[in-house]
Every structure is written in C-alpha cells, then in structure tokens.
C-alpha cells in the first residue's frame, strides 16, 4: 500500500522468483493484498484490493500502520475458501527466492506456526529492554485469558508468517493484545511480538530463514530497489514465463565493495 513504487516492484519481483519453483501441478495460489490492483493485472495472481477506509481502520487512523499486517492476514483468510488442510504463507514485499520455498509449507503444521526468525529471548537482549520496562509484573486481560510477559517470551521476525486455518483466532487475540501494547509499550515491533505471543499459547513455532532471501535493511533497500526497477522496466512486457526465468538471474546481494562504500558514505553524511 502507499505511494512508494519500490514496494510494488518488490512484490512483483518476489512473486516472480517464487513462481520459478512452483510447478503447474503444485496446489499453490498466490494472493496479493494491495491498494493498487492495477499494478498486478498482468500477473497470474489473485488480487484483493484494500480500500482507503480499510487502511484507516486497520491502522487505527494512522496511529500504528504495522497493524495493517495483522488485519490484512485476517482479512485474506476470511475471504479465501480455505479447507482445514490449507497452509497460508504470508510474505513481505522485500523477499525473494533463489532456492525453492516449497519446503516452507512442510514446516507449517496444525500444531506449528512458521516465522522468519527467532531473534532471541526478550530477557536476553538489551534492545528488547523496553518490553521488560513496560510489561514486567503486569497482567493483561484478553477475552477469558490473562497475558503476562515471561522469561520464555521471544521476539520473532514476521517478514514471513506461516499458519493454518485452525490458527485464525490467534490473529484476533494478537490484535487485542497489540492494541494494549500500542498504549503501553513504545516500540514499533509490537506487531510481530503480539502475534508470536498469541500463537505460542497454543502452538509450537519454527523459523524458515534458510529458505528466503531479503533486503529489509535501509542500505540493502537502497541497493536493491533500483536494480529491481531496472529489471522490471526492461522485462515487464515479456511473457510471464520469460520474466520468471530472467528474475532468477538478477543479483540483489551487495558486493563487499558496495557494502564498504555505503558505510563510508553513511559516515560522511
């Protein structure tokens, strides 16, 4: 959503690199949730549009725009005609695939959810101290349950989330917890933290980091977005099969020289 073309280009590149590994007989459907459906009209995907009203409601009138991810996931699951055996893999737009992502679906089980990465225990990482400062020793009532921060609470990166239909209620529970956190914990990571804490009440969690590549940091984005834009400008008119093939040849990873150059330029600013 939004006006940043880099997000739309990233979604296109992500789906093209994903499709390289999907055979015609694989029961995989790619779904895009977007404010601008026209951006994806030439791609073999199912598109669900987001209205301005939905965006405002989901972001609490702009108060916390990361809430859109939770509400968007819930919305897609409600719109799709899912069976109890279906597996849903949500991906951010700054992901791409140079190895098969299909093993990720094997990691998603009725008793196990998938996240991108376990970033560590809240009590073991200094950068998560804000959660201890504002939640330690407190109880939060959500429906008929009580939430408390524990020594086992961890931060999980939600660049990728894999769940099954039986886990759908956990999205709503996480959303209620998140709305409490919005007013009590001054951290932008409350969206993934609330979802992980919600899911871990009933399910195991595993990470899928080794199956996906990404460019989520600011300097990686600075390097990757122009490369992806150039690729799409050159190839977007080609048949989809050709785009899929050529996308695998695009090099996003920065060279050591590029990393050093960016660091020097950053220091000089």
At which residue positions do the language-model features occur?
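Extracellular structured ligand-interaction cores
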Residues: 85-92, 155-160
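Conserved donor-nucleotide/metal-binding helix-loop-beta segment in metal-dependent transferases, i.e.
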Residues: 96-135
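A conserved donor-nucleotide-binding helix/loop in the catalytic core
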Residues: 56-89, 99, 103, 115-116
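N-terminal anchoring/stem segment of glycosyltransferases
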Residues: 1-64, 79-84, 168, 259-269
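Long, low-complexity C-terminal extensions of enzymes
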Residues: 222-269
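Catalytic core and acceptor-binding pocket of nucleotide-sugar-dependent glycosyltransferases
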Residues: 142-234
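A structural signal for well-ordered alpha-helical segments within the folded catalytic domains
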Residues: 9-12, 16, 67-71, 189-193, ...
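Short His-Asn-centered micro-motif
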Residues: 1, 32-35, 91-93, 116-118, ...
């Amino acid at each position: 959503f939004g006006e940043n073309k880099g997000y739309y280009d990233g979604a296109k590149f992500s789906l093209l690199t994903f499709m390289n590994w999907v055979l015609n007989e694989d029961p995989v459907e790619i779904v895009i949730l977007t404010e601008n459906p026209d951006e994806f009209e030439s791609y073999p995907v199912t598109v669900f549009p987001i209205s301005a009203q939905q965006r405002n409601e989901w972001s609490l009138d702009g108060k916390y725009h990361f809430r859109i991810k939770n509400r968007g996931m819930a919305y897609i699951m409600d719109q799709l005609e899912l069976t109890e055996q279906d597996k849903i893999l949500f991906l951010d737009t700054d992901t791409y695939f140079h190895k098969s992502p299909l093993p990720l679906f094997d990691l998603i089980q009725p008793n196990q959810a998938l996240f991108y990465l376990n970033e560590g225990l809240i009590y073991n990482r200094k950068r998560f101290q804000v959660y201890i400062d504002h939640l330690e020793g407190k109880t939060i009532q959500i429906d008929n349950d009580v939430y408390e921060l524990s020594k086992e609470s961890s931060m999980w990166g939600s660049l990728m989330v894999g769940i099954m239909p039986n886990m759908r209620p956990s999205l709503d529970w996480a959303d209620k917890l998140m709305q409490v956190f919005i007013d009590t914990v001054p951290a932008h990571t409350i969206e993934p933290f609330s979802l992980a804490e919600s899911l871990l009440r009933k399910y195991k969690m595993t990470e899928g980091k080794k199956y996906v590549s990404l460019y989520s940091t600011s300097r990686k984005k600075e390097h990757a977005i122009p490369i992806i834009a150039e690729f799409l400008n050159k190839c977007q008119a080609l048949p989809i099969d050709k785009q899929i093939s050529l996308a695998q040849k695009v090099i996003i990873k920065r060279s050591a020289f590029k990393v050093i150059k960016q660091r020097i330029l950053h220091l000089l600013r």
